[in-house]
Each structure stands twice: as structure tokens, then as C-alpha cells.
Amino acid sequence: MLQGHSSVFQALLGTFFTWGMTAAGAALVFVFSSGQRRILDGSLGFAAGVMLAASYWSLLAPAVEMATSSGGFGAFAFFPVAVGFTLGAAFVYLADLLMPHLGAAEDPQTTLALNFGSTLMKKKSDPEGPALLFPESELSIRIGRAGLLSDKSENGEAYQRKKAAATGLPEGPAVPVPSRGNLAQPGGSSWRRIALLILAITIHNVPEGLAVGVGFGAIEKTASATFESARNLAIGIGIQNFPEGLAVSLPLRGAGFSTWRAFWYGQLSGMVEPLAGVFGAFAVVLAEPILPYALAFAAGAMVYVVMDDIIPEAQISGNGKLASWASILGFVVMMSLDVGLG
């Protein structure tokens, strides 16, 4: 991120940095084993705190200032921010609802069943990748946002998420994964898994890239929308992408993927961010009136992801207190970064 260049170029540099941090986090799969849940849960908690702080200081605060200073909304200056924030959350929610209709529910091999430290998980040899049997106490891994999509723990008791239930998987003892038509053929199954994998990754990593792009596109539009603010946002998202890369690659390694393949899919989760960042910067440069909506949209998407995905995932293995304090630490670090360097 070099001051003095165009907003679009800055957004490209910023999102390349966030992608690189994702890859660096995914590379830890070469160091840690899949059973080290405390590290993963603490990292996810830290990422949640960073995202919440970045959502306010780098996105919502400039959006509110723009809506207020424009004078066009008067006492209703909150309206564009509220609309954008709600639309951002709705975007991620609807994307999650759409996934089963795009075929994710038809091919259970896109959802990897994991049971850390358990012998209940059985693997079936497959030249294209591991086909798994679903154990009774499973952790369903969604590739993309924070890796895990699972039975959550609430006060120590497991409960089934609606998203996991949407796949139609019954509770009970391990049963073989059924094959459907041409999915039994290795070639077709492999391409289908890859296509759905890329789709899931794209949907769930757009908000971060969009936030960085919109942040750089908004530079000098208000007093709080500065280069330093946009740079700090990119650094903050890069920091929280580090554990996210690990959260994708580590479960994949535990599911039977090779270390290099787990690393590849882990870093792939950040590859879409440069595209989303450039799009966000272009959009706000060409259409300045949408800036408050765009900033709030990115914030809403990020906050929804934290509440719906990252925080619940950090609570599933009995490390809830660790994850909570890590969240506080992440929030303080990002707040200090934004205020101290802004």
C-alpha cells in the first residue's frame, strides 16, 4: 500500500496483502497437527475481535460521517447506514441459503465430516480425494469462511445449526455417503467438488475484499476516510485472515488431504479478495453517492460473518473462555491500530 497512487491500485495492493496473510496462515498446516484445537479456537476468537473493531472504526464510522455531512438526510442520516448494514448481512445470509440449491446438498463430499481425536471417522480410499463416512458426533467443515460449519456447543450442549440441517444429513450412527449418478465417476465427482468449493470460497470471502476496496475508494471523501484508515483496515483484515487460512487448511489435513493440498485450498480462500477489492474501489470512485451504503454494506457483511460463523465455531470444543478473551484482545489490537496509526 503506497500513498499517492490511485484508489483502485491501492485496493489491489491491499487485497494482495490480505491474500498473502491468508496463505501464511494456511502454511501453518506444515507445522501444527489437526488435533490442536486450542490454537485454532483462540485464533478464531482473535479474528472475530479484529473484524468487529475494523467494521466500526474503518467502515461504519466513515459511513455515518458521510451521511451526516452530506446534509441530504437531515435527522434521518442513519438511514443509508442502516440500509447498507442490513443489506450486507442479508447478502451473506442469502448466499448461505442459496448454497444447497446450487448443488452443495447433493454432493456431501463438498462437506467434510470431521471428528477431532476420534476413531469414529472412517475414510474410504478415493483417487480424487477422501470420501468420508459421517460419524455420530461430527464436525461438518465448510470450505471458505473460517473453515468449520458444525454442531455447535451452547452451554456445553450440542445443538444443530440450521445450515448443517439444510444439507439433510440425519443424526445417528455413521452411514456411508451415497453416490448420485455420475458423481460415482471419479472425473465428474472431482470437477463437481472443485466447482462447489470455489463457489463457497468466493461467496464467503467477498466481504473482506469488498471492505478493503471500498475503504480505499472512500479516501478523502470525508475527514475520517483517510489513507491511514484504509491502510489500517487492510492490515486488520490481513491479521484476521491469518487464522482463517489455518482454520481452512488444518481441518482439511485432519480429513485426509495431503499437506500441500490442504495448504492450497487454505490459501485459495483468500484468492477472491483482490477481485472483490478492485470492484469495490471502482464502484465507489464511479458512484460517490453510494459510499455510505457501500461502507455500511461491507460492515454488515463482516459483522454477520463474525456472529454467525466465527464466534460459534470458536465455542465448539470447550475452549470458549479462551476464544472470548482472544476476541477481546483482537478488538483492542485493531482499535489501537486504527486510533494509534490513523
Swiss-Prot record:
It is a multi-pass membrane protein. Pfam families: Zip. Its main location: membrane. InterPro entries: ZIP. One of its GO terms (cellular component) is membrane. It catalyses: Zn(2+)(in) = Zn(2+)(out); Cu(2+)(in) = Cu(2+)(out). The chain crosses the membrane at residues 12-32, 44-64, 72-92, 194-214, 263-285, 290-307, 322-342. It comes from the Eukaryota. Keywords: Cell membrane, Cytoplasm, Golgi apparatus, Ion transport, Membrane, Nucleus, Transmembrane, Transmembrane helix, Transport, Zinc, Zinc transport. GO terms for biological process: zinc ion import across plasma membrane; zinc ion transmembrane transport. GO terms for molecular function: copper ion transmembrane transporter activity; zinc ion transmembrane transporter activity. It is found in: Cell membrane; Nucleus; Cytoplasm; Golgi apparatus. Belongs to the ZIP transporter (TC 2.A.5) family. PANTHER family: ZINC TRANSPORTER ZIP11, ZINC/IRON TRANSPORTER. Zinc importer that regulates cytosolic zinc concentrations either via zinc influx from the extracellular compartment or efflux from intracellular organelles such as Golgi apparatus. May transport copper ions as well. The transport mechanism remains to be elucidated. This is Zinc transporter ZIP11. The lineage of its organism: Eukaryota, Metazoa, Chordata, Craniata, Vertebrata.
